[in-house]
Amino acid sequence: MTAQPQALKIRRPDDWHIHLRDDDMLKTVLPYTSQVFGRAIVMPNLALPITTVAAACAYRDRILAAVPQGHDFTPLMTCYLTNSLDAAELVNGFEQGVFTAAKLYPANATTNSSHGVSDVKAIYPLFEQMQKIGMPLLIHGEVTDAAVDIFDREARFIEQVMEPIRQQFPELKIVFEHITTKEAAQYVQEGNRFLGATITPQHLMFNRNHMLVGGIRPHLFCLPILKRNIHQDALRKAVASGSDRFFLGTDSAPHAKHRKESSCGCAGVFNAPNAIPAYASVFEQLGALDHLEAFCSLNGPRFYGLPVNTDFIELQRVATTQPEEIAMGSETVIPFLAGESLSWSVKA
């Protein structure tokens, strides 16, 4: 029997999907990301969405001002696509190096997505421009038709929206974000080099039974919602395969405790404090620790055409109990796996 490794050294990872929020929440949550990750794709769905170069620059400045001294972190900004977005603004932002990618939210699919796109085909001209300049499209892949069951919305999105986009724009770089189903995993695996996907730690570790059996666990509620175990298993097999189509995207999405624990709680899991140890635990369970570095640190930069980070982090086999809550002024935020123990930790 092979001895278990006591330490792992991997190239510094990047987070290809994160919500940093703004104001006090930004200042509270950012250090958990900036101390471990070199870069992060920052979601643009603030209360006032990021739809202009000026707004992206201002938000980037607020993020950089909140980075603790000694952390070397680069936020990668995204543009929120709307029905009326000016193509010139999108192109200029990308060519100036302000926008790294553009984000497609189907209207009302998730938090702060009411400004999202109601008719995807109406913004095909934007996709044409993006394909021409090599700008990646990041997609929250769920239909929002009220007649479609919430557990079926991702699979339905593939046939109704994703495949038509890819047929029309075969060389448009697309990230199918936070995939949650066996259909999505298979679709990405069978795709080409223009299609990639991010996978969160919660969708690898849990399924809907964990959220709903024996009482509702609101801090596991996120969108896309946790699915049944056959889908969880498909995601685990996808990352264990070593395929370079899949890469790290935490979708860390913090909300104040009272907004999660309410009669109509918000969707989002705040996993930034322990994402890397959580991923490491999953990869170890799958006997796939040799693929952890590629998933965390190599596949994403390769897809985006960016250099990999030059420095490294070290994980240690030190069991660590996760905090029950994190203070944010007079409020608190509940982290992923609160009060539970993980067998890996990132060396400070």
UniProtKB/Swiss-Prot annotation:
The modification N6-carboxylysine is found at residue 103. Substrate binds at residues 19-21, 45, 140, 223, 255, 267. Zn(2+) 2 binds at residues 103, 140, 178. CDD domains: DHOase. Its EC number is 3.5.2.3. GO terms for biological process: 'de novo' pyrimidine nucleobase biosynthetic process; 'de novo' UMP biosynthetic process. It catalyses: (S)-dihydroorotate + H2O = N-carbamoyl-L-aspartate + H(+). InterPro entries: Amidohydro-rel (IPR006680), DHOdimr (IPR004721), Dihydroorotase_CS (IPR002195), Metal_Hydrolase (IPR032466). Homodimer. NCBIfam families: pyrC_dimer (TIGR00856). This is Dihydroorotase. The gene is pyrC.
